[in-house]
From Swiss-Prot:
InterPro entries: Ribosomal_uL13, Ribosomal_uL13_bac-type, Ribosomal_uL13_CS, Ribosomal_uL13_euk/arc, Ribosomal_uL13_sf. The keyword DNA-binding does not apply. One of its GO terms (cellular component) is cytosolic large ribosomal subunit. GO terms for molecular function: mRNA binding; structural constituent of ribosome. GO terms for biological process: negative regulation of translation; translation. Keywords: Ribonucleoprotein, Ribosomal protein. Part of the 50S ribosomal subunit. Pfam families: Ribosomal_L13. This is Large ribosomal subunit protein uL13.
């Protein structure tokens, strides 16, 4: 089991690395999901996520698609998009993923990994928004 601290990591790069780990059969736990960052212009990011959450079908709006508003679910959905979700292999890989806001008691004191290639300090222009800020904008709890 790998415990990854998402604090200061770029969401897309984190998601691609984690998706690869899941497909290789590893169990992955991500903590501090609300502190992961999405790079780009703040207004454009907020507009994109707002449009996603308001998507509905005209025939029956209860059918979806449904996009999350909580920060841990936003991270899970991003990783799901990088897995072959419609195959049995992709669904089994997705079940091996756990995402948490903050650090739960069961993982406190354990060694947390980070992904150096995905760290925000590698950006040339530090324009980003945290996943927690996006979730708060969408009306999520965390």
């Amino acid at each position: 089991m790998r415990i990854i601290n998402a604090e200061g990591l770029i969401l897309g790069r984190l998601a691609s690395k984690v998706a690869k780990m899941l497909l290789e059969g590893e169990e992955v736990v991500i903590v501090n999901a609300e502190k992961a960052v999405i790079t780009g212009n703040r207004d454009v990011i907020f507009k994109k996520y707002k449009q996603r959450t308001e998507l509905r079908t005209l025939t029956n709006p209860r059918r979806g698609p449904f996009y999350p508003k909580r920060s841990d679910e936003i991270v899970r959905r991003t990783i799901r998009g990088m897995l072959p979700w419609k195959t049995d292999r992709g669904r089994k890989a997705f079940k091996r993923l756990k995402v948490y806001v903050g650090i739960p008691k069961e993982f406190q004191g354990k060694e947390l990994e980070t992904i150096i290639e995905a760290h925000v300090s590698r950006l040339s222009r530090p324009k980003y928004v945290t996943v927690g800020e996006v979730a708060k904008f969408l009306g999520g709890k965390f």
